[in-house]
C-alpha cells in the first residue's frame, strides 16, 4: 500500500482545481496545467485539499494513486511558485545566448546550435556560460534541460560540455605512457 497516496495535496488560495472525470486542470498565477490520470485512481477535492485513493478492481490502485499524488503536487507547486533548472557550459569558447524563445549555443561545432523553447518555458543567460530555465511544468523543464545537455554532454576526461548546475562529473585519469 502506498504511503505517498495517503497524504493529501494542499491547494493554496488562488489556485483553481477542476476535476472532469480523470482529467484534472489546475490553474494558478503561473498558468494552467492539465493532466489525465490513470483509471485506477480516484481523486476528491474538498476543504482546499486533494485526496487520493484506489478504485475497486485494480491491482495497482495504490501505486497509481501515489504516482497521481506526486504529479498533482508538482502541478500545484508549478502554478504557484514555478520551477527552475540551471545549466552550465564548461569549455573554451562555449557560449549561450537567448533571443526571444530561441536559445543560441556555440558548442565547438562548425555551426551554431539554435534550440526552440516550447510554450510556457522561458530562458535567460545571467552569464555567457550559464542558462536558467523557468516554467510551471516540471516535466517539460526537465526535458528541455536534457535536450540542451544532449547537444554536448560532459566528456569524462576534462569535463567539457553542457551540465546541470548541481551535476558532479566524474573525470577519468589520462592514459599513462
Curated annotation (Swiss-Prot):
Record keywords, A-Z: Ribonucleoprotein, Ribosomal protein, RNA-binding, rRNA-binding
Organism: Salmonella dublin (strain CT_02021853)
Keyword Ribosomal protein: yes
Pfam families (alphabetical): Ribosomal_L6
UniProt-listed SUPFAM superfamilies: Ribosomal protein L6 (SSF56053)
Keyword Oxidoreductase: no
Name this protein carries in UniProt: Large ribosomal subunit protein uL6
GO CC term (a single one): cytosolic large ribosomal subunit
Disulfides per UniProt: none
Family classification: Belongs to the universal ribosomal protein uL6 family.
Matches recorded under PANTHER family: 60S/50S RIBOSOMAL PROTEIN L6/L9, LARGE RIBOSOMAL SUBUNIT PROTEIN UL6M
MF terms (GO), sorted A to Z: rRNA binding; structural constituent of ribosome
Function: This protein binds to the 23S rRNA, and is important in its secondary structure. It is located near the subunit interface in the base of the L7/L12 stalk, and near the tRNA binding site of the peptidyltransferase center.
GO BP: cytoplasmic translation
InterPro entries given in the database record: Ribosomal_uL6-like, Ribosomal_uL6-like_a/b-dom_sf, Ribosomal_uL6_a/b-dom, Ribosomal_uL6_bac-type, Ribosomal_uL6_CS
Subunit structure: Part of the 50S ribosomal subunit.
Amino acid at each position: 500500500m502506498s504511503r505517498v497516496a495517503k497524504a493529501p495535496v494542499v491547494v493554496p488560495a488562488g489556485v483553481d482545481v477542476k476535476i472532469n472525470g480523470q482529467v484534472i486542470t489546475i490553474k494558478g498565477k503561473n498558468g494552467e496545467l492539465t493532466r489525465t490520470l490513470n483509471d485506477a485512481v480516484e481523486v476528491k477535492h474538498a476543504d482546499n485539499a486533494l485526496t487520493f485513493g484506489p478504485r475497486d478492481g485494480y491491482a495497482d490502485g495504490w501505486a497509481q494513486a501515489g504516482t497521481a499524488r506526486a504529479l498533482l503536487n508538482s502541478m500545484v507547486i508549478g502554478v504557484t511558485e514555478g520551477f527552475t533548472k540551471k545549466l552550465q557550459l564548461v569549455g573554451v569558447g562555449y557560449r549561450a545566448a537567448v533571443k526571444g524563445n530561441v536559445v543560441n549555443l556555440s558548442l565547438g561545432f562548425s555551426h551554431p546550435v539554435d534550440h526552440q523553447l516550447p510554450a510556457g518555458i522561458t530562458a535567460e543567460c545571467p552569464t555567457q556560460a550559464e542558462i536558467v530555465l523557468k516554467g510551471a511544468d516540471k516535466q517539460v523543464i526537465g526535458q528541455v534541460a536534457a535536450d540542451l545537455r544532449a547537444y554536448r554532454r560532459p566528456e569524462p576526461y576534462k569535463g567539457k560540455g553542457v551540465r546541470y548546475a548541481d551535476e558532479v562529473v566524474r573525470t577519468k585519469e589520462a592514459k599513462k605512457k
